[in-house]
Amino acid sequence: MTLNLCVLTPNRIVWDSEVKEIILPTNSGQIGVLPNHAPIATAVDIGILRIRLNGQWLTMALMGGFAKIGSNEIIVLVNDAEKGSDIDPQEAQQTLEIAEANLKKAEGKRQTIEANLALRRARTRVEAINAV
Amino acid sequence: MSCSNLTMWVSSKTSLSDSTALSFRSSITPVQLPSNNSTTANPSRPSSVTPIHCGLRELRDRIVTVKNTQKITEAMKLVAAAKVRRAQEAVVNARPFSESLVEVLYNINEQLQTDDIDVPLTKVRPVKKVGLVVVTGDRGLCGGFNNAIIKKAEARIAELKGLGLDYTIISVGKKGNSYFIRRPYIPVDRFLDGTSLPTAKEAQAIADDVFSLFISEEVDKVELLYTKFVSLVKAEPVIHTLLPLSPKGEICDINGNCVDAAEDEFFRLTTKEGKLTVERDIMRTKTTEFSAILQFEQDPVQILDALLPLYLNSQILRSLQESLASELAARMTAMSNATDNANELKKSLSIVYNRERQAKITGEILEIVAGANALT
């Protein structure tokens, strides 16, 4: 049996093809999905999606969302997804530094919420590059 | 030589009928500057419309100006038309996402109907302050597009004031920004710039802002004001409630009509027996079944928590896209009208110009004949 992965963002289809195995960053920890997985619905955290294609591992930074695993059909709905190879390392590192600085400066409940989210996104992007 | 010619010309003009009074007036001005004329009159002899006749030259200049303007408006129209197509493509690209999302949301809602769930984004609080997200365009020259949405916002503000509610504005788009900056008495939470093509990132920025405003309980209700794209010639400003999301409301048919995902559903803030209530009208449409056996990895609340921000995002993105499409369509119509007007103006100006030119030629012939007659 083959496993089909479909990663959708509001803008475009990021990934729509066959994979061997994926590791999905869910809210309750990472789960590996192989063919013939039981149908589940899960929330996807901000984190790294690992995809195995013929013995090769690819990474993708996911910005939080939702995944539905059906009969060998995975649909991942996320706000934004970027392939690790498409991220500019320098730019990602800079964004991370800015986000860290912003969190330190943040005052009040609202700014802290915003800064925390931004920091987590930035960190994930950097990790997606380095994880390869 | 040229000076005597001039006086001759002026005298011959006076002998003409009243209809040329205007051109006579303008042709008299060069007489006051004879030095200027004597230099230009001789080299430009072959071209019939010499600088002496300012009326003609002005007309010609105006025709050229109108022609240039027409070229610009025509180009803008074509650009807008091309961009409308791109905007439509963006909507089409967003469709698979919103379709799957609505499908999943619908089914999860179905399975959760019985449970008593409590998700922050769906919490309906007594409304004290309302956040208004106003989506305008970045540029003008698009007819009444920006005006219409700003008027709608003003009307809504007046309405909220009438209800004794506080409000704050999140302005998206340069036109709205400059409008609200000029009016400091309107509280604005944040100014955001639109870009040429709305992306998920932009929607995310707005969603983040809205999200934190709502979660930190600064506002108790968020409304989105944008221009709904109906057709190329019709667009209307609408108000759509973003938050609180109704956990039962996100329903639509999945047969491709998902761009209008929650359009069937309208929220109105009204007063009922002296209390503020939110009215909901929901039109239920059929949805196809999907795999019945679905386990939830986490708590249903957590899953909804993950889904609703996505939904919020896609709603905002869609409204941005619709707003852009409306703006471009409005610009297309406005520019097409401008081009038509320019054509008309050009036509009437050329008629006037040709008449004047003929009058001038007639005058010259009269002059020559009179001169010849005098000699014999």
From Swiss-Prot, chain A:
UniProt subunit comment: F-type ATPases have 2 components, CF(1) - the catalytic core - and CF(0) - the membrane proton channel. CF(1) has five subunits: alpha(3), beta(3), gamma(1), delta(1), epsilon(1). CF(0) has three main subunits: a, b and c.
Gene3D superfamilies reported for this sequence: 6.10.140.480, F0F1 ATP synthase delta/epsilon subunit, N-terminal (2.60.15.10)
Bridged cysteine pairs (disulfide): none
NCBIfam families recorded: ATP_synt_epsi
Protein name: ATP synthase epsilon chain, chloroplastic
SUPFAM superfamilies membership: Epsilon subunit of F1F0-ATP synthase N-terminal domain
One GO CC term, this protein: chloroplast thylakoid membrane
Pfam families cross-referenced by the UniProt entry: ATP-synt_DE, ATP-synt_DE_N
Membrane topology: Peripheral membrane protein
Family: Belongs to the ATPase epsilon chain family.
Its job: Produces ATP from ADP in the presence of a proton gradient across the membrane.
Subcellular location per the Swiss-Prot or TrEMBL entry: Plastid, Chloroplast thylakoid membrane
Keywords, sorted A to Z: ATP synthesis, CF(1), Chloroplast, Hydrogen ion transport, Ion transport, Membrane, Plastid, Thylakoid, Transport
GO molecular function annotations of the record: ATP binding; proton-transporting ATP synthase activity, rotational mechanism
HAMAP family: ATP_synth_epsil_bac
